[in-house]
Amino acid sequence: AGAKEKEDGIRKSQKILLTWLVSDERIFGQIKDYISPEDFSDGIYRKAAGLLFQQYHDGEINPARIMNYFTDEEEHRKVAALFHTRIEELTSEREKEKALMETVLRIKNHSIETATRNLEPTDMAGLQRLMEAKKELQDLKKLHISIN
């Protein structure tokens, strides 16, 4: 699989997570300590995630307000798609929890890989943050996300 395919897979994971966050507010409480808007790809993904996370902190989820933030027609359409990604039918709660966990891990792992590639060799503070992020990733693997 090439870098392009991997990037598309990550974007799909990010869309799925944003869709889940909009459709089930309980999920945010379980992932907020592990995933931040900075874990999303640059551009509209990160911006939309940032606005959504801010709405969670303010206690009022309103995807339409987020979409209205993007005035460019093309961006507006893409953001609408972010919140309405078709998620394959997962029949059991357990399947949903497993898929959610895999999605969160994939996004966090990609975020760490990207930060590692872009890290300046002399950036000790950045290196320290990466080490902490990798430890969080290990903790995250032990976490059980419950959606019922």
Language model: regions and residue ranges:
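Bacterial replisome coupling helices
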Residues: 53-148
